């Protein structure tokens, strides 16, 4: 049970780091690029500083290079925390944003759709299974083109997502909702704030991650 909860917690927060994946899974590579008018700049040496109430500070840097994984172009990022520096991958195609990486405790590769630049009310669900136990991550576009203030700074052109988290009932027979939260992304910036909470079989956790500083090159 503790492993399942740790798995869930680790993939809950977008800002969490992901271990570098064997790039033989994909092919190619090249210089990064992409307009900053979307929700994830990828230009080389762009930087973001975050603070998580659970995990402490983190520093993310866009490497400005990419690789092809599962036929999709993924941009490379390094994130440094007190535990060290790890590699993450982000894909953005036609307004659909994905993240990809290894989850160490079970050695499983995970690919998540974490954002869609779609109409209000659009929703989608990522299903992730480990050893026959599945959890479900539902995102809904709640608001678009709003202002949102984080650590005293007001961001424009923000999209707000609501998040619902459900798991297979380990006692069998149903899926139960155990938590949820919200995510905020600003155009030309990226993730600016995320928070969540969950409670499952007597174990609960909350986290808020906020953007402190950023530089887009």
Placement of each model-derived feature along the sequence:
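Positively charged n-region of N-terminal signal peptides that target proteins for export
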Residues: 1-4, 18-19
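C-terminal motif of bacterial Sec signal peptides marking the signal peptidase cleavage site
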Residues: 13-16
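Conserved functional acidic sites
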Residues: 21-217
